[in-house]
Amino acid sequence: MLALASAGVLAGAVACSDNDDNNGPVPVADAGPDGGNGGLTDAGGEDSSTEPPGPNTIAGVVTQTVLVATANDPNVVNAWGLAFTPAGDAAWIADNGTGNISVYDANNTLVNTITVPVPDGIDTAAPSGLIANSLPDNFNGDAFIGVTEEGTVIGFPADGSDPAIRYDNSGSGAVYKGVAIATSGGQPLLLVTNFNAGTVDVFDANYAPTTITGGLTDTTLPAGFAPFNVATFGAAIVVTYAKQDDQKHDDVKGEGNGFINAFDLNGNMATRLASNGTLNSPWGLAVVPNDAAAIQGRLLVGNFGDGKINVFAAALTDSANMSATFEGVLGDSANNPLSIDGLWSLQFPPNAGTFDSKVLYFTAGPNSEQGGAYGSIAIISQP
């Protein structure tokens, strides 16, 4: 188990991809509905954070590009889930604030807007986690699977027909935030974080509720913390935890408000990867590709609470020997931590297609989730 130290700033020069079309990088003044940038910078700009680095700082350079924001796509409000087509030709963005999915190509051109269905009695969906279906022979053959804060699981058919509610748990008060696919004992499973109930709900290949052997539970977790996001890497099911508010609907931000666990593929607790420290409502999860030019193989954990990106040297391929060593946070040329207001997803595209698989893409809901952003960070130097 690792209790995180104060934030260091990790090396990793970051360049921003150029885009000249009308949906290209958004000027700072246009990135939020109130005219502010919500902590986001445009191409070539540096993050404006002035927070001093903590001890054991490692110098780094980080800039970022905002590719799409509320100013040039009003549907992109509190952009949350992010998933790429397996062919690597489109990015799907869950617009939590407007109940849509926005689909963009690699040139940042809007190619489709999809309305997320809602249960009876609810006007607009609040989509959160979103994934591409990596097991297309299962889960009704849906191309993408999303979840909502109303407690529904949504399937997006591969033939392009309208999405459908595959499971409706809204009656129980479920609040779904994250979603992942795992194979356990040869069986495909859908894993969904239920922030209200404090559980990871499990579904079989037909979207029917089921169980996983180990239960994906941690009896040592402090009261008031609940599963926030989930992802699978190697032999690990990684679950992040955030502090619940009184309604058990939203997280309570604050430095130290977070935990990360690794479970084996049978749902048994393997190890606590990280506790408290720099964690602040951790949600974004990604592993840097091994062919990337910098921090390859590292586990990246994005804080929704303060927008920082924590970097871990993690071992996740052997269920008996899982671990994570905190290395720092991504930072700018002045050793200030990069901070993306309202940071949600962190994703690398697949090797196939027109997106650069070495570029890190993100979504965010700046300005207290009233704005939205989809952008990129290209890591180009060694730490």
Enumerate the language-model features and the residues they cover.
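Bacterial N-terminal signal peptides that target proteins for export
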Residues: M1-A3
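Exposed boundary/loop context
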Residues: A5, V28-A31
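C-terminal motif of bacterial Sec signal peptides marking the signal peptidase cleavage site
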Residues: A11-A15
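Sequence/structural signature of beta-propeller domains
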Residues: D18-V26, G45, S49-P383
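Intrinsically disordered, low-complexity serine/threonine-rich repeat tracts
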Residues: D30, D34-N37, D42, D47
